[in-house]
Amino acid sequence: NCEVLALCERLGLRVTLSDDRIGRAIGDGNHRAELLRAVVRDYAGYPALHGYHITDEPNSGAFPALAAVRQILADLDPVHEAYINLFPNYASAEMLGNPTYYDHVRQFADTVSPAIISYDHYHFIKGEPMESVDMGSRRENQIYEAAFRKVERPGFFDNIEDVRRVSAETDTPFMVIVLVVEHGPYRN
């Protein structure tokens, strides 16, 4: 990571950094502060550092631990934000850990107090005949199978509206990651 940060600095780029110690800190409350102090010590001084990537698409059961990680990082390094990306609204209630998508986003904002609410929504689907493929996990299989059921996944603007509503209610800015690179079952 240090080499990448140094290269990005030379190129005028900024990085939201991922480090395995952050992932370990989520599940290890006993060593959380120690792990995160080491992360901040290693990276906070790099001008190319934009922020710390905590996790992608968490279930609501993880929100209390994510809130603790976010707060520790904010206390140790108030200059660089801690980043968490949420599921889109086509995730199941089981994946979310909440009965509705709005409830999931609202609980995230209330529990984690993020600097920004971020989510991705990939609604352009190839729509090819479904083949039997094991993607390695139940979650990935669900996403893969759902992708072949529709050509244009519905709910893109409903997703924006749910997040916009929570954003306005909590005075937290939001961003959406849209599909720009064709991969897996997704198309441009």
Positions of PLM-derived features:
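Glycan-processing catalytic domains of CAZymes
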Residues: 1-188
